[in-house]
UniProtKB/Swiss-Prot annotation:
Name this protein carries in UniProt: Multifunctional 2-oxoglutarate metabolism enzyme
Spans annotated as 2-oxoglutarate dehydrogenase E1, C-terminal part: 336-1227
Residues the record lists as binding thiamine diphosphate: R540, S604, L606, D645, A646, A647, N678
Residues binding Mg(2+): D645, N678, I680
Catalysed transformations (reactions): glyoxylate + 2-oxoglutarate + H(+) = 2-hydroxy-3-oxoadipate + CO2; 2-oxoglutarate + H(+) = succinate semialdehyde + CO2; N(6)-[(R)-lipoyl]-L-lysyl-[protein] + 2-oxoglutarate + H(+) = N(6)-[(R)-S(8)-succinyldihydrolipoyl]-L-lysyl-[protein] + CO2; N(6)-[(R)-dihydrolipoyl]-L-lysyl-[protein] + succinyl-CoA = N(6)-[(R)-S(8)-succinyldihydrolipoyl]-L-lysyl-[protein] + CoA
Record's GO cellular component terms: cytosol; oxoglutarate dehydrogenase complex
Gene Ontology biological process terms from the UniProt entry: tricarboxylic acid cycle
Region (2-oxoglutarate dehydrogenase E1, N-terminal part) residue spans: 1-41
Region (Succinyltransferase E2): 89-335
Cofactor(s) listed in the protein's UniProt record: Mg(2+); thiamine diphosphate
Name of the encoding gene: kgd
Coiled coil: 783-814
Effect the entry attributes to changing R1062A: Loss of activation by acetyl-CoA
């Protein structure tokens, strides 16, 4: 018995073969072996230790006869001389029979002989256990399907068995011992570590097969992922011939798997130096069922078995211990925790299949549960989807009780049973295993789908048919194209980070996949033959989108980083580089179409641009006649809107804008929403920023399908993008894509996010980018080579570097203070706004040109008749003057859009722009008749009048966007009361008042704000004149408060005809709508124009004497009529009233000319109804004395006291205050 068995065991032949090669030519052996082989001394082999050599059989030649032996002397007996080996002893040479072939066993074969002989010295026994293999089989299918979809590779049964053996050894360390004689004494040696020996079958160059046993060292310290990596490393190096001496030594327990050859039960030999060897047999059904059909086996609940044997050294391991060891392996292979650990280690986010007892219920009962399970996946499958690339909570499986087969009374034994599915996945019957495969592929992989909240069954079916059907994998060319987009996205950010360290750019790092996603949206729109995609997005990633989607030249982007300004675009304040817009043309890579692409300008106010985009797109659609009123290729301009997750859930304008989606006055035929969900809002976690499960839950209010997709899967992102466009085209509805990703850096490049999200950023800091992960996947699948990937990235980086160097060489323009935009647009000096009487009469007649059989409400008919009368006889009121202005513009070919809450009728029952049939509810719009000339030809004009949703923010934003999208349209929005316009303050501040100065974005939008103190309380009084005057500068807007119907008429017509695009803010009347004094004659419409300053009629008609005036009252709006009535009552010839109709820009020349006509004025007062700190006074009190010091030095105010609210809530207090103003004015 050897006291020191070879450390290489059955691998000794390989070591000796390497030694012979090393001895003959050291360079022929891997250098890692040199140090060992220098001192190696091979033991005698079987063929050299005895005379038992075998040779190739040949004809036997008789030996030469030996001389006759001499007689033996009669001496004392001597020890018998050694004779030739007797036949019974193995050392004796055998003589092959004639015709036999013999071969000397060398190398591996000789080592096998030696090792088998040595193994005879080990007294062994064997324990045998049959273990159910079904759970291992089913979970291996789940594992390998996941690996196939993700990083590639496979898990074998041997991987699982080997790991189970290692875990069992932890409970039974004696199984890891081996026997040795130490100092002449029998000893049981317990190694410090478990070194699992793997029997690896290798095929040589000559085709001969050999077996080596290499060790996975220190297995007990490894988790499953580490164990698999070490396992695969050993196998790979064995097949590449790169194993080292260290790999062969120190095996403590072995695993052999003859089951791969079909062997069911094996009792392997145990080599010296080991305590046990585990044999794994083939997986088979019990013999008595091997002739049964699959259906019968499934019905009976029969599973395959695997037979494990434990052959152990009986000197140190007892049978009970070996049996318990196998029982522990048995338990592990059926244990929930064992497979839970494996799934977590492999990054599989789903629960493993569980070992449960078969449920004896009938197949009919179970069939109903299967149908319920299908419905559950359609409803809740998204809750189990693997959509978070960070997997911050990697200890929790994505699961839901409704999606657990066990919750439905089903078990793993039902997986191979067939059930009726009534057309699910296009078939009538299907195995539960296949049903689950379809459901999980459809709803639980890298895409989670929410659609069962949609009320229309047709739309649900449409989605089901597409997501439950296996979709084609992208072609290699398409994969390379996706990779090129990822390359471009990442390289752009890396370049800017390197070249412009510390500059804010709000990078897209961590969310680069949105670039191929957006590209897929635009490409699919082009595939459908659409006209344009208009994009709105926040600042994060905007520069990347400008460069890689819109196609803005890199040189221009880099110039903006360098601080270079284009002199031709230098007017106005400008804006930061990540707020600017651009336009471009997208050309399909794999198609023949192209499509226009534009990116709207936006402020930092998140989501404020949403309604602006919708309005802009609707305007473009109406221009192309493909909007709500169009018929061919409806809604051919597509809004593509990007959001942040925190903003989408948190900003109310999102819900306001979504609410417009299906309204006839606001529909755009479906918006594609992409939420770039980086799972954080600056420093706020989702748990603190929303109460809903998803940031996108708000979109369910309009029945929009929602696709949650893992941003680390570019192919899934591109597939979802194309599906979203197809749905939009099929149903003209919004679609929401929630792309989960992360933010590589802080909110901006100077921020350290680890201060508030340390764990998240520990994960992010070690995470590979999506480009690298996708590249590795493509290379691993053999779709591209490493060189192709590196070349593509280098080419893009080189292109950026060249442009960067060119920009650095540009001559920098000297930076000067910004210039005003005021001079960029001027109203024509001789613009005619009057119309002839025939036009007035035509509009009047239109109000009674009712459709045949149309029944007018009895309270509305007098209004229509009165309008026709006014058109012919005069005394035209405010409401009709407005309709005359709009109708005449329509007749001249202008598209007029008027919207607001209750706008068709008017808040104050004054407008009646749309007449409703008393009996049928049909609508008649008189002004639409003006779109046709008397001879029947179209004028080109159109009247679009809509009641809006009860919204200010979204409604005003939409109309602003519409005015940008169609600069030639007359776009008006009316507040229900002027007080409510502050609900749209962000739109007013960020777009209406400053859009031109910041972005050169022009708008002609008109805001009609009912304003006036009439005792209705603080929320029904003021349109906040002071706020608009504070915002006004550089001619950014026109602000007016006309006091006569005719002046209002001319103001609107001037705005519609002046050819410039600047917003118009009009403070319109309420009580004055029915003031009999507030009317205008026909000649005021046919002969006049807008007058920014108005004197009293008595002076313009020559009836009053201006020289008698010593007290001048300047005012604006409704209070003029109260002042005029008081003056007439008191016959005050010393008092004159001058109205400033245009509050901004101030008509300084006309104002000065008017005041010069009153030479004897001693006192000048500004009279207003508003409190002292509101209305026009805060502006006029400062600017009038400044711009006209000769006329307004000493100007005094008459008004209500300064107040925090616009007015008193008491009508009686209001009356007292109003009287006090009048008394003071004439005091």
């Amino acid at each position: 018995m050897s006291s020191s068995p070879s450390p290489f065991g059955q691998n000794e032949w390989l070591v000796e073969e390497m030694y012979r090669k090393f001895r003959d030519d050291p360079s022929s052996v891997d250098p890692s072996w040199h140090e060992f082989l220098v001192d190696y001394s091979p033991e005698p082999t079987t063929d050299s230790a005895s005379n038992g050599r075998t040779t190739t059989a040949a004809p036997v030649t008789p030996p030469t006869p030996a001389p006759a032996p001499a007689p033996e002397p009669k001496a004392a007996p001597k020890p018998a001389a050694k004779t030739e080996a007797k036949p019974a002893k193995p050392a004796k040479s055998a003589t092959p029979a004639k015709g036999d072939e013999s071969q000397i066993l060398r190398g591996a074969a000789a080592a096998v002989v030696k090792n088998m002989n040595a193994s005879l010295e080990v007294p062994t026994a064997t324990s045998v256990r049959a273990i159910p293999a079904k759970l291992m089989i089913d979970n291996r299918v789940v594992i390998n399907n996941h690996l196939k979809r993700t990083r590639g590779g496979k898990i074998s049964f041997t991987h699982l068995l080997g790991y189970a053996i290692v875990q069992a050894v932890k409970k039974f360390p004696n199984m890891n011992r081996h026997f040795a004689v130490v100092d002449g004494k029998p000893t049981a040696i317990t190694p410090a570590h478990t070194n699992l020996g793997l029997a690896i079958d290798l095929q040589g160059k000559d085709g001969n097969r050999s077996l080596v046993v290499a060790a996975i060292k220190r297995c007990e310290t490894m988790r499953f992922g580490q164990f698999i990596a070490a396992y695969e490393d050993i196998v790979r190096r064995a097949r590449d011939g790169k194993l080292t001496a260290e790999d062969f030594s120190g095996v403590t327990i072995s695993l052999t798997n003859p089951g791969t050859l079909g062997t069911v039960h094996s009792v392997p030999r145990l080599m010296q130096g080991q305590g046990a060897i585990i044999g794994a047999g083939a997986m088979e059904y019990p013999a008595e069922f091997q002739g049964a059909s699959e259906e019968r086996i499934a019905d009976l609940g029969i599973g395959k078995l695997i037979t494990l044997t434990s052959t152990y050294d009986h000197r140190i391991i007892q049978g009970a211990e070996s049996g318990d060891f196998l029982r522990t392996i048995h338990q592990l292979l059926l244990d929930d925790d064992f497979f839970d650990e494996i799934f977590r280690e492999l990054g599989i986010p789903y629960e493993p299949v569980r070992w449960r007892t078969d449920n004896p219920d009938s197949i009919e009962d179970k069939n109903a549960r299967v149908i319920e399970l299908i419905a559950a996946y359609r409803n809740r499958g998204h809750l189990m989807a693997d959509i978070d690339p960070l997997r911050l909570d990697n200890t929790r499986f994505r699961s839901h009780p409704d999606l657990d087969v066990n919750s439905h009374g089903l078990t793993l034994w039902d997986l191979d049973r067939e059930f009726k599915v009534d057309g699910f996945a296009g078939v009538q019957r299907k195995k539960l295993r296949d049903i689950l495969s379809v459901l999980r592929d459809a709803y639980c992989r890298h895409v989670g789908v929410e659609y069962t909240h949609i009320l229309e069954p047709e739309q649900q079916r449409w989605i089901q048919e597409r997501v439950e059907t296996k979709h084609d994998k992208p072609t290699v060319a398409e994969q390379k194209y996706i990779l090129s987009k990822l390359n471009a996205a990442e390289a752009f950010e890396t370049f800017l980070q390197t070249k412009y360290v510390g500059q804010k750019r709000f990078s897209l790092e961590g969310a680069e996949t949105v670039i191929p996603m957006m590209d897929a949206v635009i490409d699919q729109c082009a595939e459908h033959g659409l006209d344009e995609v208009v994009i709105a997005m926040p600042h994060r990633g905007r520069l990347n989108v400008l460069a890689n989607i819109v196609g803005k030249p890199y040189s221009q982007i880099f110039s903006e980083f360098e601080g270079n300004l284009n002199p031709s675009q230098a007017h106005g304040s400008g804006d930061v580089k990540y707020h600017l817009g651009a336009t471009g043309t997208y050309i399909q890579m794999f198609g023949d179409n192209d499509i226009e692409v534009s990116l709207t300008a936006n402020p930092s106010h998140l989501e404020a641009v949403d309604p602006v985009l919708e309005g802009l797109v609707r305007a473009k659609q109406d221009l192309l006649d493909t909007g709500e009123e169009g018929s061919d290729n409806r809604f051919s301009v597509v809004p593509l809107m990007l959001h942040g997750d925190a903003a989408f859930a948190g900003q109310g304008v999102v819900a306001e804008t979504l609410n417009l989606a299906l309204l006839r006055g606001y529909r755009t035929g479906g918006t594609i929403h992409i939420v770039v969900n980086n799972q954080i809002g600056f420093t706020t976690a989702p748990t603190d920023s929303r109460s809903s499960e998803y940031c996108t839950d708000v979109a369910k209010m309009i029945g929009a399908p929602i696709f949650h997709v893992n941003g680390d899967d570019p192919e899934a992102c591109a597939w979802v993008a194309r599906l979203a466009v197809d749905f939009r085209q099929a149903f003209k509805k919004d679609v929401v894509i929630d792309m989960l990703c992360y933010r590589r850096r802080g909110h901006n490049e100077g921020d350290d996010p680890s201060m508030t999200q340390p764990y998240m950023y520990d994960v992010i800091d070690t995470k590979r980018g999506s480009r690298k992960a996708y590249t590795e996947a493509l290379i691993g699948r053999g779709d591209i080579s490493m060189k192709e990937a590196e070349d593509a990235l280098r080419d893009y980086q080189g292109q950026l570097e060249r442009v960067f160097n060119e920009v650095r060489e540009l001559e920098k323009h000297e930076i000067e203070p910004s210039e005003s935009v005021e001079a960029d647009q001027q109203i024509p000096s001789k613009l005619a706004t009057a119309v002839d009487k025939a036009m007035l009469q035509r509009i009047g007649d239109a109000h009674l040109a009712l459709p045949e059989g149309f029944t007018v409400h009895p309270r509305v008919r007098p209004v229509l008749e009165k309008r026709r009368e006014m058109a012919y006889e005069g005394r035209i009121d405010w409401a009709f003057a407005e309709l005359l202005a709009l109708g005449s513009l329509i007749a001249e070919g202008k598209l007029v859009r008027l919207s607001g809450q209750d706008t068709q009728r008017g808040t104050f029952t004054q407008r009646h722009a749309v007449i409703v049939d008393r009996k049928t509810g049909e609508e008649f719009t008189p002004l639409q008749l003006l779109a046709t000339n008397p001879d029947g030809t179209p004028t080109g004009g159109k009247f679009l009048v809509y009641n809006s949703a009860l919204s200010e923010f979204a409604a005003v934003g939409f109309e602003y966007g519409y005015s940008v999208g169609n600069p030639d349209a007359m776009v008006l929005w009316e507040a229900q009361f002027g007080d409510f316009v502050n609900g749209a303050q962000s739109i007013i501040d960020e777009f209406i008042s400053s859009g031109e100065a910041k972005w050169g974005q022009l708008s002609d939008v008109v805001l009609l704000l009912p304003h006036g103190h009439e005792g209705q309380g603080p929320d029904h009084t003021s349109g906040r004149i002071e706020r608009f005057l504070q915002l006004w500068a550089e001619g950014s807007m026109t602000i007016a408060m006309p006091s006569t119907p005719a002046n209002y008429f001319h103001l609107l017509r001037r705005h519609g005809k002046d050819g410039i695009q600047r917003p118009l803010i009009v403070f319109t009347p309420k009580s004055m709508l029915r003031n009999k004094a507030a009317v205008s004659d026909i000649r005021d419409f046919t002969e006049s124009k807008f007058r920014s300053v108005l004197e009293e009629p008595m002076y313009t008609d020559g009836e009053g004497d201006r020289n008698k005036v010593t007290r001048l009252l300047l005012t604006s709006g409704k209070i003029y009529y109260e002042l005029a009535a008081r003056k007439a009552k008191e016959n005050r010839e010393d008092v004159a009233i001058v109205r400033i109709e245009q509050l901004a820009p101030l008509p300084r020349r006309r104002l000065a000319e008017t005041l010069d006509r009153y030479p004897n004025v001693k006192e000048k007062f500004w009279v207003q109804e508003e409190p002292a700190n509101q209305g026009a006074w805060p502006s006029f009190g400062l600017t009038l004395p400044e711009i006209l010091p000769d006329h307004f030095t000493g100007l005094k105010r008459i008004s209500r006291r300064a107040m925090s609210a616009p007015s008193s809530g008491s009508s009686k207090v209001h009356a007292v205050e109003q009287q006090e103003i009048l008394d003071t004015a004439f005091g």
